[in-house]
Structure formats: C-alpha cells, structure tokens
C-alpha cells in the first residue's frame, strides 16, 4: 500500500502510463491528503510498536506520498488564488457538492430519427436561503422572466454534458453539480440532452441540430420557469464543450439548421460561452497519444463520425470549431463574437490540451474576446468534485464572463 501510494503520487509529477491518472484524484485532494496523513500516523505507530526496516520504509514512502500530494494541491490552490479566487475550503472536500436533482425534467423532443427521448433538467433560480425565487404556495417560479425584487431580467445558463458524444445525459455529475450551483447564484439553469452516438448511429450532425432544437425550446419555455432567454449563456464540458463552441460559432456564421416547430420558434442569441476541457480538435482527440486511453477515446470519435479522420475527413472538419473561427476571421467578425472562456488541465489524458492551445490561437487570430487558462498539474474532469479548486476557479471566471455579457442573475 505504501509503495503504491508513493508511486501514484510521484506519477502526479512525472508521466507514468496508467498511474498518472492519479491526477484525477485532484478534485478530492483534501480527502486524499487526509487519508495519507492517517496512513502515516498508523505506520508510525506500527513502527514504534515493532521497529523494523519494512515499517521504516512504509513510513518513508507514505510521507513521500503525503508531501507530493500536498505540493500538488498547494500548486492548484496557488493557481486559483492567482486568478483572484477566494476558495471555499469546505467545498474542497466534495461534501455536499454533488448538486440537487432538477426541479423539473420536461421532455424537449421525442426524437424519431434517433429513437431517443431528449429531456431537459431545469434548476429554478434560488434566493440566498435556497428557496425558489418568486415561488408561490405551489412552489412554482415567477413567470415573468424577471427578478421577484426588480425589473431586471433573470439570465439563463444552458449546460451541455460531456461523455465523448456517446455517454451521459443532463444528470452527469459535473453537469448536475454546476447547474445546481448556477441556480444557487440566482440563474435559471437548464441542462439539455442531445442524441448519443451508438455503433449503428453516427450523430455528428444530429447532435448539433438537436442542441439547436433544445435552445429553441429554452427560448419558448424559459419565461415560464422564471428566466429571460434574451440573456443566455452556453456552458459545456468535454464533448459538450465542443457542441457549445460549435453552436456559438455556427450561429455567428448564420449556419444553424432550421429548427422544427416542435422545438420552438427560433434559437435565441447566445451571449457567452464557457467551457471546460472542450474537444476543440476532433482529429487530435481521435489521435490521442496516451498509451492507455487512446483505444477508448478514438473509438468514441469513430462512433460519432462513423469513421477515422482518414476515412471521413470532411466530418471531422465539420465538427471542428477552429475552422469556423477561421471563417469568422476572414469575414472580420471575430471581435463581435460572444466572449469565450476555456479552462483546461495541462495534463489532460482524455482530451489533449493541444486542442485548446490551437483554439486559443484561432481566437486570438480572429480578434475574438476570450480567456484561456491552462491549469498546471490538472487532468480531465477536474470538476468531478464541483467544489474542487479548479472548478471554483472556473466558476469565478464564468461569473465574470456572464457579467461582461450582461447575463445576470436575479437580484436577491
């Protein structure tokens, strides 16, 4: 146990195939640190009762693991503080951070083309005590799209889950945790399903068209849930981040597919887009160099597009947000784009960070308003504990982004 703990901790600093996924423990760094401290104390007590080389070695290895883990955790905390974040120390433990279930889960579309039922998870805006803002005796929200205390509009945050385009739904742990948090800040938060790819169904076109459908549904229903879809931001992680970027930039280009009447009248204007570890380079995602993850990741890309980049290059190009940014740059439209936020771990083993670096370069070339953060010693799903240091950093920056874009919460 001591040897494995030391090796796994060392792999947080030095790349070790397979073991370096220990970085994914980062979201629970405080818990892992506490466990290691207990193990060190147990090992010290055992050595005191029965001294020996094996017990001394166990103490040494566990202490090494404790020191390395503390160092990695401190580096992430220091990074968060450098962004102006005042960390909630209790949230770092992950206790109580998983988020509540949605208040309602209405059907958005019974998708006959895919055979999948697409729903929305709706988290109603909360007051400072956790109560639904403007709720009456039935618990229903105010239906004006305005704050119960003022005439200011209540912004809407729409979330798109990750899962390699083939897994997950509106209740993914990261999505649920962040949606509940946005609602606690006074926003109307809505997480949308989109059709998942299967071995027999490539959804590279359908997923984007159904997200557009979901947004049109939000525009038609937000007021009934106490929000104003004229002030709307998109949020997405991993594959959901790809979809959020794609929809935002396609809307700017006027390339969104027409939506069915069943969805709603039209897709609302997207005012801001905030992503975590997005798939910005679909080819790079397929060609993931990680020795362990590569087969699983490339299979998801092939399932989504029904082929490899060599077999269907046009499909990989069609889902690449950087290509849309290049078109926007050519047309001089970059400066008028909605502001974009990207936060990505420098040691992401699932979605290579080089995709985000190239996306950042494309945004810079286009002159688009954006903020890109590459977090040190951080892997994929750093918000699996939504209260982790990096998740809190992303939240802090996202609130700044929403304020910049005039997507504001209810006054409480």
Language-model segments: residues:
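Catalytic nucleophile-loop/oxyanion-hole region of alpha/beta-hydrolase
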Residues: 169-179, 190-229, 385-392
């Amino acid at each position: 146990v001591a040897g494995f703990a030391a090796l796994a901790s060392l792999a947080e600093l030095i790349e070790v195939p397979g073991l370096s996924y220990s970085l994914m423990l980062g979201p629970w760094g405080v818990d892992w640190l506490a466990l290691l401290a207990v193990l060190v104390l147990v090992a010290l007590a055992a050595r005191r009762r029965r001294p020996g080389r094996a017990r001394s070695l166990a103490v040494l290895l566990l202490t090494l693991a404790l020191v390395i883990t503390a160092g990695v955790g401190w580096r992430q905390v220091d990074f968060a503080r450098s962004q102006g974040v005042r960390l909630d120390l209790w949230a770092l433990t992950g206790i109580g951070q998983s988020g509540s279930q949605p208040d309602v889960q209405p059907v958005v579309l019974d998708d006959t083309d895919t055979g999948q039922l697409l729903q929305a998870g709706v988290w109603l805006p909360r007051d400072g005590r956790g109560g639904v803002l403007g709720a009456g005796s039935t618990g229903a929200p105010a239906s004006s799209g305005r704050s119960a205390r003022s005439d200011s509009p209540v912004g809407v945050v729409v979330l798109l889950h990750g899962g390699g385009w083939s897994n997950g739904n509106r209740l993914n742990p990261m999505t649920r945790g962040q949606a509940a948090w946005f609602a606690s800040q006074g926003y109307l938060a809505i997480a949308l399903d989109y059709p998942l790819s299967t071995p027999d169904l490539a959804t590279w076109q359908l997923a984007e068209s159904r997200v557009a459908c979901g947004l049109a549904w939000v525009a038609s229903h937000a007021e009934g849930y106490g929000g104003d879809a004229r002030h709307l931001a998109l949020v997405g992680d991993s594959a959901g981040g790809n979809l959020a970027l794609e929809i935002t930039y396609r809307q700017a280009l006027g390339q969104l597919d027409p939506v069915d009447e069943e969805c709603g009248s039209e897709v609302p204007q997207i005012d801001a887009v905030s992503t975590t570890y997005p798939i910005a380079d679909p080819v790079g995602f397929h060609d993931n160099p990680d020795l362990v993850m590569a087969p699983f990741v490339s299979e998801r890309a092939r399932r989504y597009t029904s082929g490899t980049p060599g077999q269907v290059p046009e499909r990989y190009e069609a889902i690449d947000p950087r290509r849309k940014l290049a078109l926007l740059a050519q047309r001089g439209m970059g400066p008028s784009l909605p502001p974009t936020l990207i936060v990505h771990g420098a040691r992401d083993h699932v979605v290579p960070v080089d995709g985000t670096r190239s996306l950042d370069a494309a945004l810079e070339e286009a002159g688009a308003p954006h903020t890109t953060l590459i977090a040190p010693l951080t892997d994929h799903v750093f918000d699996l504990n939504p209260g982790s240091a990096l998740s809190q950093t992303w939240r802090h920056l996202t609130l700044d982004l929403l304020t910049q874009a005039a997507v504001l919460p209810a006054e409480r």
